[in-house]
Amino acid sequence: MTLEMSPEQIQESKIYREWGLTDEEYLKIKDEILGGRLPNFTETGMYAVMWSEHCCYKNSKPVLKKFPTTGPQVLMGPGEGAGVVDIGDDLAVVFKAESHNHPSYVEPYEGAATGSGGIIRDIFSMGARPIAILDSLRFGPIDNGKTRHIVDQVTAGIAGYGNCIGIPTVGGEVAFDESYAGNPLVNVMCVGLIEHKHIQKGQAKGVGNSIFYVGAKTGRDGIHGASFASKEFGSGSETQRSAVQVGDPFMEKLLLEACIEVIQNHGDILVGIQDMGAAGLVSSTSEMASKAGSGLRLNLDNVPQRETEMIPYEMMLSESQERMVLCVKKGHEQEIIDLFKKYDLDAVNIGEVTDDGFYTLYHKGQMVAHVPVDSLAEDAPTYYREAKVPERIQKFTDSEKYLPEITDSAVSEIFKKLLAQPTIASKKSIYETYDSRVMTNTVVAPGSDAAVLRVRGTNKALAMTTDCNARYLYLDPEKGGAIAVAEAARNIVASGGKPLAITDCLNFGNPEKPEQFWELTTAADGISRSCLALDTPVISGNVSLYNETNGSAILPTPMIGMVGLIEDVKNITTQEFKKAGDLIVLVGQIFDDFSGSELQKMLTGEISGKIDFDLETEKVNQDFVLKAITDGLINSAHDLSEGGLAIALAESAFANGLGIDVEVDLSNAQLFSETQGRFVLSISPENQAAFEKLLTESSASSEVIGKVTDNGILKINELSISTDEAVSIYEGALPCLMK
């Protein structure tokens, strides 16, 4: 039980500092907001979580304003539980990504599981039925025992929650780097489908309307979780287990179905709905009121509790999972109670909407908080941080390009070593723990460029992916940010989809350090540039800052989640070569792009140098490939990324056990170059003429570089290895390293 302090004791002890408030912020609350009154224990705690970076984006709000967020396809952008994009037929796709980084280091299983649960609630709070989960994971070196434990438990947590609730985990990415050793990244994306008429907002309006608490009971888990996520890791952070929530996917399944039933069958009495996520009850209710320009009066005696003698501070800040807030029209309370009772869930009237603009709490007949509602939400502070270019950036800019030399005798061994690199090697051992087929909508499961799910009742499908190569951002945040969006779009296009929009998780270091704030704001410039060029507005997202351990920051890692629309399921394309005799086509030119590459990291142990990125060529090549797919000319398509052409060719050959015979005018090293904007395609010989005719109508570059064979040999210039041996290395590397 938390011991409550008096307002005077709070001021004297400055305990608010431990909760994340600065002296200046505390004085602002006391003098400017409360007119000289000392905030009490509950009020101070509420401001501490609501003014955390995790809740109010006080350091990143100016950066987020750079993003393009509108477009004809966007029905709802940032500001609600998730973004909503039109896909025609009065249907929309709803999606968002969230981070659960700090909790997943302290308690990897529960941290990852509750990260999944939280983002699922964001989706069904919009009225959508969740249809897919994707993840983006970053870990330290896998030869470290602690890292292996975190990998094992994080993936088990995601699998456990998704498998139990019955939502398929269909895609994602995993990468390893020293910078994540003390600060893994666990980003989870959820995608849902909705009819336009059921789209909801998180708002509490209409004087006298009732505020309902629904779902699981409140405990003491997760108190100050939002503040915990807004600080650097230090030597004692691993012991902060009370800040980590505990999830129950079976409870969430009931909550999901109950909320969907309310929205679809009782939408006329539902004013607003929101998930109780970070900062729990105070965040959800104050945000709903602030967005509507209302006030709220809540009676905490009615809050369902699973622990005894909880004080208002604990009830308001608890981040117990599987809880929602509903605003219901006055006079219809019993309908809500009866509906949730059918699912054996609590549905309790805890307050009402007012018109005084205040957030007022009562407990045991006493007023325990009375503050302006906007001061908790819309009027939280915003900081304009100093940005300074890190010294390393100038060094990289002035340096020569990294140009490795690989002899004919060494190229096959280099290729084998690259196949076994943890970031490149097959993640099959991870994604096979996920149920990717439940709900029976999955057409393309994990392992291809993007996951693809059919849209039932239509001839359409959705392609979805997560992407980011943080090494590029370390060398050049602007170009790296632009590349992250472009690679996500390449994955969608290679699957036959037209990119629609993105969500993001901006994982960066301490924004109070000018060099790290520069990384954030510069990466946002690059993301915006690609979003504008590729017509993929930012419709939702999340910011996770202070990803540092003992002063050492992670690589800047803005994860991009993207969804694309496949208008006709016949255009769904996968990366594997289909049959011997098909021609292998390279779209895009290959240059000496080794800075930040997997090859550079493997051969030198570091990354350095300057990177190039031609966004105009990227767009041209993507448009050409998508047109070739929709014209029915392509049998397979795969984007080139880590490991370059050689790795992409191998991955395309693996699934069906085929061979390749490729002769291409490249040096041995260039087989592993990571020039952007490239695809490997396979086409039937009878489609070659039509393909080349289409090429003449585009400014894209393309050449036939070989053919698919059935001899089981991967031959690329002087590189030669059996497909079976390559598959064995590729699929066996990660399980071997995890032992």
Swiss-Prot record:
Annotated metabolic or biological route of this protein? Purine metabolism; IMP biosynthesis via de novo pathway; 5-amino-1-(5-phospho-D-ribosyl)imidazole from N(2)-formyl-N(1)-(5-phospho-D-ribosyl)glycinamide: step 1/2
Q: Name one Pfam family in it.
A: AIRS_C
GO: which molecular function terms?
ATP binding; magnesium ion binding; phosphoribosylformylglycinamidine synthase activity
Q: Which InterPro entries match?
A: PRibForGlyAmidine_synth_PurL, PurL_linker, PurM-like_C_dom, PurM-like_C_sf, PurM-like_N, PurM-like_N_sf
Q: Where is the active site?
A: 54, 100
GO BP, sorted A to Z: 'de novo' IMP biosynthetic process
A single cellular component GO annotation: cytoplasm
Keywords, A to Z, come to:
ATP-binding, Cytoplasm, Ligase, Magnesium, Metal-binding, Nucleotide-binding, Purine biosynthesis
Query: Where is Mg(2+) 1 annotated to bind?
Result: 98, 542
Q: Which residues bind substrate?
A: 99-102, 121, 245, 319-321, 544
Give the superkingdom in one word.
Bacteria
* Localization, UniProt: Cytoplasm
Leader sequence residues: none
Question: What's its top-level EC category?
Answer: ligase
Q: What CDD domains does the record point to?
A: PurL_repeat1, PurL_repeat2
- Annotated ATP binding sites: 57, 96, 504, 541
Binding site residues for Mg(2+) 2 = 122, 275
User: Its principal location?
Assistant: cytoplasm
Q: Which reaction does it catalyse?
A: N(2)-formyl-N(1)-(5-phospho-beta-D-ribosyl)glycinamide + L-glutamine + ATP + H2O = 2-formamido-N(1)-(5-O-phospho-beta-D-ribosyl)acetamidine + L-glutamate + ADP + phosphate + H(+)
Q: What is its EC number?
A: 6.3.5.3
Q: Looking at the keywords, is Nucleotide-binding present?
A: yes
Under the heading NCBIfam families, the entry gives: FGAM_synth_II, PRK01213.1
> What family is this?
Belongs to the FGAMS family.
State its role. Part of the phosphoribosylformylglycinamidine synthase complex involved in the purines biosynthetic pathway. Catalyzes the ATP-dependent conversion of formylglycinamide ribonucleotide (FGAR) and glutamine to yield formylglycinamidine ribonucleotide (FGAM) and glutamate. The FGAM synthase complex is composed of three subunits. PurQ produces an ammonia molecule by converting glutamine to glutamate. PurL transfers the ammonia molecule to FGAR to form FGAM in an ATP-dependent manner.
| Protein name according to UniProt | Phosphoribosylformylglycinamidine synthase subunit PurL
State the organism of origin. Lactococcus lactis subsp. cremoris (strain MG1363)
Provide the taxonomic classification. Answer: Bacteria, Bacillati, Bacillota, Bacilli, Lactobacillales
